[in-house]
Every structure is written in C-alpha cells, then in structure tokens.
Amino acid sequence: MTSRDQPRPKGPPKSTSPCPGISNSESSPTLNYQGILNRLKQFPRFSPHFAAELESIYYSLHKIQQDVAEHHKQIGNVLQIVESCSQLQGFQSEEVSPAEPASPGTPQQVKDKTLQESSFEDIMATRSSDWLRRPLGEDNQPETQLFWDKEPWFWHDTLTEQLWRIFAGVHDEKAKPRDRQQAPGLGQESKAPGSCDPGTDPCPEDASTPRPPEASSSPPEGSQDRNTSWGVVQEPPGRASRFLQSISWDPEDFEDAWKRPDALPGQSKRLAVPCKLEKMRILAHGELVLATAISSFTRHVFTCGRRGIKVWSLTGQVAEDRFPESHLPIQTPGAFLRTCLLSSNSRSLLTGGYNLASVSVWDLAAPSLHVKEQLPCAGLNCQALDANLDANLAFASFTSGVVRIWDLRDQSVVRDLKGYPDGVKSIVVKGYNIWTGGPDACLRCWDQRTIMKPLEYQFKSQIMSLSHSPQEDWVLLGMANGQQWLQSTSGSQRHMVGQKDSVILSVKFSPFGQWWASVGMDDFLGVYSMPAGTKVFEVPEMSPVTCCDVSSNNRLVVTGSGEHASVYQITY
C-alpha cells in the first residue's frame, strides 16, 4: 500500500539487480544503502542511534565482502602455482639434455632475465623445476635450498594454509631419496681414542664429523649393517610428523578412563591399565642401547651404550632427537658400560660395566654432571645394579657370581655374596631381601639380616630379567624361553603369567604395580595386566628391544631398540 503524499528519495539508484543486496558494481551497494537509509529517515520516530547502528553494520558487511573477494583471489593464485608446476613436469622431456650441446643463445637469455622481469609464478615455477631435475649428487650446492619461507605471505586463513601444505607435500615426497643419503649424527661430542670397545670390534669413527665414504676404518660388513639399521630407524619426513608434539606433563591434559562420564564409580587411576601408547620421541643414541632410564621429575631420559651415557631432555618438541643434552663418555681405555640405574629420587645415576675399577655414581642435582662417588669393584665385571636409598645401600651383580653391597655414605664394601657358578645376570632388592637370577635358571633370595644360605627356586630356563611389584609380594621373572613367571616373596607359590614368542630381555613393573612392560627378541613392547598376566596390547618396534623403563609418574615408557630409544606416552 502506497501514498502519493509520502516523500520519495532524492535520487533513485542508478542500477538495479534482480536479487536484493547483490550488485555487479562496487558503487551500487553504497547507493542502495543510502537510498534505504534516506527512506528510513523520513519516518518521524527514526532514531539517530539506530542510524549509527545501521552504518556500522553496513561497513562490517562491506569489509566481509572485501575479505571474501581477497580469499578467492588467494586461492586462485595457489591453484595457478600448482597448475604451473604440474605442467612443467610434462615439459621436462622437451628440454635440452646434459649430453646435447645447448645453443649459444640459450644461456644468455637466462642470464639476462632479471627478477624484476619475472612474475611471482614464473619464479616459483623456474626454481621448482630446477630443484626437481637436480641430481642427488648436487645437494651441496646453494641452489638446492628450498625456496619458500616458513610463513609465506599468503598464509591468512586455514583453508589457504592447508592448500599450501598440500602443495609443499609434493616436494617432501620428492625429497625423500635425498634425505636418506644424509648420514645421521651421533651427538655433539667426539669420542676419545681410549673409549673404543674391547674385543674384535674396531673403534667406529665419530659420525658427527664429515668424512668421505672410503675413509671409514670399519669393515665393509659393519658399515653396511650400520647404514641399514639407520635406514630402519629413520622415518620419512612425512611420517615423522605424526608424533611431532610436546610430551604432556599436566594430568588435566589426559583423557583417562576414570575421567569419562561412563566410568565406574570405583574406578581409580591406581587400578587402571594402559589403553594406548603413543610414540612421542625417537632418541638416536648412535650405538646399541644396552640400558635405559627415565625421570619424570627432571624430565630426562638416560640411554646407556658401550661407550658412555647420553642424557636427553624431554621438554623440547622434536620427532627424532640426534643431539643429547649431555654425554658421559667412558674415560678408561679398554672398558665399556653394561648397565645404568636411576635412583628412586632421580638425584643420582649409577653406571657399571666391564674392565672398570668402580661403579660410578653421577650427581644429577649439581649444576654440572660429575661423579660424586666411586664404589670399588676392581677385577669385577658388572651386570646389573640396584639401590636402597632408605638404607643408603647400593647393590651390584657380576659375571663372576659375586653380589656386592656398598654403603653409600662412605663407599665401603658392606658384604660380598657368593655362590653363583655361572654368574648373576639380574638383581632386584625389596625390603631386606635380595633377589637374583642368572644362566643357571635358579632364582635365589638372600636375607641381608642373616648370614644363612639363600632360598632357591629352580626354573627350567635362564632368568634374563627381574622386577618386583611395588605394592604386592611378587617378583616378576622374564625367561629365555619367552615365559613370564610371578614368584611369591612370602612363600613358594608361583604361576606363569603369559609367554612371548622369543627371548625376554627386560621386564618392568609400573609404579602402582597394576601392569608391567615386557620386551625381548620378538620386536614388540608388550603390556600385561596383574594378576593373571593378561596381554593388554603390543607395540611393534623395528628391531629387537633390549631394555625398557617406566617413569615414576606412570605416564611414560622408554625402550631401547637397536641404536635408538623410543619414548611413549601412556593413556589410561
């Protein structure tokens, strides 16, 4: 309904659109808006405040329209770049081959062409094509460096960022063969001449120092095996990023079962077993990892090899770490390490091995790492270590069959336990009892308060590893035949709790004793629950797993496999 007396707008719109609010020209939205506003101002009750609100809404909508137009423009640029790079791959067969002589005018034309005369797409296409055609042997030339920045100028929204990552992923796939040719470094410190391993194995050169392939002092077979193992350890750049994230130290960050709405009323973290292990870090130790230890208090991992201990920080964000925070090398010529032990308070690290005059106690609480105590063991080769900080005692088992006890306050020898003809391979201490196992398949229990002979429990296979339950009266045995046994510490009761397919090399109870980790020659990290030893799940590794450890906060597991260690984060 209209009225002839109703005033009309001063100026009608110059153009109209079949759809309201949509126009082909940039000036039309302004005229439409002004016309509508002038109509509204003719009403006597039209508030100036309402006019200001409409003005603000209009400019906001206009800004959104400009952003959408800019967004479409950026997507068009990215698609043009991808299309140009795809076309260049089809033209490579028409280019001049290295064996054919190029015309004299061709290099001159490339030389005379400047960056000012080239568009952004031409520069991207030229460098990308040159990088894709370059042989692997020319990686040392400056032109092989990737041409894009970490944050290109057109990263303004999520969609464009994802498109750019898809485009960059094409180059990551092409770069895989080139990356695998690079030799990984073993650390920041070079090894001393006296730190070589005894026996027939020659001293390997420091891999962190560049050298030609023919200059290697190791035999061809050894170098081939070492390169092969590194190729297995290294993951392609595209796959390593799936666990490229920081390790969580905040309990609120975990989606554990007892926090879920469907959790049972009595469910508690002390009764839970892991439901998932997520690989968070690979630590490239550089030689066979013989023992590992992890501290959630200091947030460090300790990896033990024949030539020394390497200390790794867990606070960074890197998928594969090649550079340890510290390196504790062997200084005695002809000696090598065999094992290490982190004290329960994470303030000390005990190390022992072969041809060493003592077991070293490293001070982890000092500003700089140093040996604060030497526990004498001249002429003995250490196999395993344990400690009781409440009683200030340290324990070690040796290949000669001796178990030695030291007083940590004055480093004196308290007692030597003898009677193992085939040596002692593993040792655990719980209360006043010392449990030992070895190649003779006999589990022995010594009481520190008496001088009586130990209790003996005979098994049918060699005892490779021991671990005591922190909450119950059980000792866990890992056997050479793949069996796992629980032996009661208060009686003769025992039962088998699962079996692996090959030799078990290490077992470790969790801090609450509700599950344990088991590793061995089957290339798997297995998680088993108490008390029946039900297998919860297994995590595959690339090679036999020699050792494992569980952090005191019940959140991390570290394993040693080949020349590297893996750090897993636990979700319950």
Curated annotation (Swiss-Prot):
Instruction: Give the consequence of mutating E541K.
Output: In OZEMA15; uncertain significance
The places in or outside the cell where this protein is found are:
Cytoplasm; Nucleus
What effect on the protein does mutating T298R have, as reported in its record? In OZEMA15; uncertain significance
Please give the positions of the paired cysteines in each disulfide bond: none
Outcome, altering A396T: In OZEMA15; impaired formation of the SCMC complex
Polar residues bias: where? 14-30
Q: Does the keyword Transcription regulation apply?
A: yes
Supply the SMART domains for this chain.
Answer: WD40
Q: What is the effect of changing R409Q?
A: In OZEMA15; uncertain significance
What Gene Ontology cellular-component terms does the record carry? cell cortex; cytoplasm; cytoplasmic lattice; nucleus; protein-containing complex; sperm midpiece; subcortical maternal complex; transcription regulator complex
Q: InterPro entries annotated for this entry?
A: Groucho_enhance (IPR009146), WD40/YVTN_repeat-like_dom_sf (IPR015943), WD40_repeat_dom_sf (IPR036322), WD40_rpt (IPR001680)
Whereabouts are the WD repeats? 284-322, 332-372, 377-416, 419-456, 458-497, 499-538, 540-571
In-chain residues carrying the UniProt-annotated modification Phosphoserine: S510
**Which Pfam families has this protein been placed in?**
WD40 (PF00400)
Q: Which UniProt keywords apply?
A: Cytoplasm, Disease variant, Nucleus, Phosphoprotein, Repeat, Transcription, Transcription regulation, WD repeat
Q: Which family does it belong to?
A: Belongs to the WD repeat Groucho/TLE family.
- What is recorded about the domains? Contrary to other WD repeat Groucho/TLE family members, does not contain any identifiable Q, GP, CcN or SP domains. Only the C-terminal WD-repeat domain is conserved.
Q: What does this protein do?
A: Component of the subcortical maternal complex (SCMC), a multiprotein complex that plays a key role in early embryonic development. The SCMC complex is a structural constituent of cytoplasmic lattices, which consist in fibrous structures found in the cytoplasm of oocytes and preimplantation embryos. They are required to store maternal proteins critical for embryonic development, such as proteins that control epigenetic reprogramming of the preimplantation embryo, and prevent their degradation or activation.
What's the protein called, per UniProt? Transducin-like enhancer protein 6
> Native species of this protein?
Homo sapiens (Human)
